[in-house]
Amino acid sequence: MDVKRVKQILSSSNRIDVTYEGVPVWIESCDEQSGVAQVYDVSNPGESVHVNVTALEEK
């Protein structure tokens, strides 16, 4: 995935399924400069991680 698509997903009112290393995640935010997104595991929303947007996959 790229930063442009992450931004589109963030601004969308639709639910768009995204995974990180095969795990379903919600995208919380994206830093366009660094290409890093803050994501939460759908099954464990209490913990977030920062990942490179290229590691995210749209399902």
From Swiss-Prot:
GO terms for biological process: asexual sporulation; sporulation resulting in formation of a cellular spore. The keyword Cytoplasm does not apply. It comes from Bacillus cereus (strain ZK / E33L). This is Small, acid-soluble spore protein H. GO terms for cellular component: endospore-forming forespore. Keywords: Sporulation. Belongs to the SspH family. The keyword Cell division does not apply. It is found in: Spore core. The lineage of its organism: Bacteria, Bacillati, Bacillota, Bacilli, Bacillales. Induction: Expressed only in the forespore compartment of sporulating cells.
